[in-house]
Amino acid sequence: MGYTANDIRNICLLGHGGDGKSALCESMLFTTKAITRLGKRADGTTVSDFDDEEKKRQYSISSSVIPVEYNKCKLNVIDNPGYFDFAGQIVQSLRVVDAGLICLTAKSGIGVGTEKGWKYLAKAGLPAMFYVSKLDEEHAEQVEQALQMAQDFSNGVSNLMNYSYLMAGKKDVSDDA
C-alpha cells in the first residue's frame, strides 16, 4: 500500500533494558495482524531481535525498524537497545523520528533508561510519550508510576490522570478517575 507523507509517522522506543520495548513491537505487529503469534525473546523469535548475537544474549544490540500499518497510516517504530553501551544507536534514531515513546515497567518504575530517554528527547526537541509495561505482574503499581512520572517530569507530562490501558481481563483504570 502506498502512503503519502501525511500518513507516515516515525517514532522510536526508549527505555532501560528489559522494560518491554521489543515486546511492545511484538504486540503492535500481532494486534495489526502483521504476525500470527507473539515472538518471545527467550525463544529467539522476536521480530526486532533477528541477529544471532541478539538471540544469544537475549537483548537488543542494534536498532530495528518495525513497520506497523494501522488505520490507513504507516507507523515506523524504531526499537532501540535498552543498554546504554549501545547509546549511539539511540542518538542516530532521534535524527529521523517525530517523537519518542519511553517504556518503563510498573514494577521497576523510573530508572536510568527512563531518565536518559527523557533527556535525549528533550535535547533533540522531540515530544515524548510514556508506556508502562508489565501491568499484570504481581506488585505492579500503575497509579503510583503515573504520579511518579508527574513529579519527576513535571514540566513535560500532562493529562496523566486521563491515561488508560488495555489488557485482556483487566478493567480500564481511567474509569475510576
Task: Give the predicted meaning of each segment.
Residues 94, 99-160:
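Conserved C-terminal guanine-recognition region of P-loop GTPase G domains, centered on the G4
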Residues 1-104, 108-110, 154, 158-160:
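P-loop NTPase switch module centered on the Walker A-proximal segment
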Residues 157-177:
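Alpha-helical transmembrane helix bundles of large polytopic membrane transport and channel proteins
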Residues 42-43, 118, 164-168:
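Residue-level signal for alpha-helical context at structural boundaries
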Residues 48-52, 117, 173-174:
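Short amphipathic alpha-helical patches
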Residues 67, 134, 163-164:
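Residue-level "edge-of-site" marker
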Residues 25-26, 40, 88-90, 114-115, ...:
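Short acidic, glycine/serine/threonine-rich loops at helix termini
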